[in-house]
From Swiss-Prot:
Name recorded for this polypeptide: EEF1A lysine methyltransferase 2
Organism, as annotated: Homo sapiens (Human)
HAMAP family linked: Methyltr_EFM4
Gene: EEF1AKMT2
EC number: 2.1.1.-
Major location (coarse): cytoplasm
Signal peptide: none
Protein's UniProt keywords contain Endoplasmic reticulum: no
Tagged with keyword Nucleus: yes
Localization, UniProt: Cytoplasm; Nucleus
Family: Belongs to the class I-like SAM-binding methyltransferase superfamily. EFM4 family.
Any one of the GO CC terms: nucleus
Cited InterPro entries: Efm4/METTL10, Methyltranfer_dom, SAM-dependent_MTases_sf
Keywords associated with the record: Acetylation, Cytoplasm, Methyltransferase, Nucleus, Phosphoprotein, S-adenosyl-L-methionine, Transferase
Length: 236
């Protein structure tokens, strides 16, 4: 389950809007926040991959993947560091990590079709050092823990749009993150729904902002800003 757009790839998740009835946090509930939506998306993408070999969308675009990998290289993250991709979708980011030499990487998604698709893509690439699990990050099994790095490219965005008590689901997300990430471990999040300040508030308990990564800027009506927020937190 992942979504968003970043200067060249991916379908944007709609955030706050003047259409529909926003909840108390300002988000309009959407099918984009439901498991049924993502099951249907990845069932279609799996069929397309089987028929045409098309891997589907690169969520947030290739530049977003490269941005995260550059950060990991800059900070000399060991190639055997344990990395968790939360809401891995088609697993393309896992493939890129493996190609850069990372050898202890895991992708989870609550959609079985997403895990099937990512497994097929990984097999086609001839990679064998990637672990995949069907996991709901809000209701984790006891097997996931002790990761050095957790990465989110749109999953927190989608959870924020869930029609069924999204605020509580966001709180559970933070609890799950705290559980799976090692103390002093890093959390890299890319979002098109949340600003830097809002993400700081959402992850204020137990996490500290380490770095804001550069993202594309826009200018409109005399104002400028970032269409995407990309932050690195460290678990305290």
């Amino acid at each position: 389950m992942s979504s968003g757009a970043d200067g060249g790839g991916g379908a944007a998740v709609a955030a706050r809007s003047d259409k529909g009835s926003p909840g108390e946090d300002g988000f309009v509930p959407s099918a984009l926040g439901t498991r049924e939506h993502w099951d249907a998306v990845y069932e279609r993408e799996l069929q397309t991959f089987r028929e045409y070999g098309d891997t589907g969308e690169i969520w947030f675009g290739e530049e977003s993947m490269n941005r995260l990998i550059r950060w990991m290289q800059k900070h000399k993250i060991p190639l055997d560091a344990s990395v968790l991709d939360i809401g891995t979708g088609n697993g393309v980011f896992l493939v890129e990590l493996a190609k850069f030499g990372f050898s202890n990487i895991t992708g989870i998604d609550y959609s079985p079709s997403a895990i099937q698709l990512s497994g097929s893509i990984i097999e086609k690439e001839g990679l064998s050092n990637i672990k995949l699990k069907v996991e709901d990050f809000l209701n984790l099994s006891t097997q996931l823990s002790g990761f050095h790095i957790c990465i989110d490219k749109g999953t927190f965005d989608a959870i924020s749009l869930n029609p069924d008590n999204a605020i509580e689901k966001r709180k559970q997300y933070v609890k799950s993150l705290s559980r799976v990430l090692k103390v002093k471990g890093f959390f890299l999040i890319t979002s098109c729904n949340w600003t830097k300040e809002e993400l700081l508030n959402e992850f204020s308990e137990g996490f500290e902002l380490l770095e804001e990564l550069p993202t594309p800027k826009f200018s409109f009506g005399g104002r400028s800003g970032n269409s995407v927020a990309a932050l690195v937190f460290q678990k305290m």
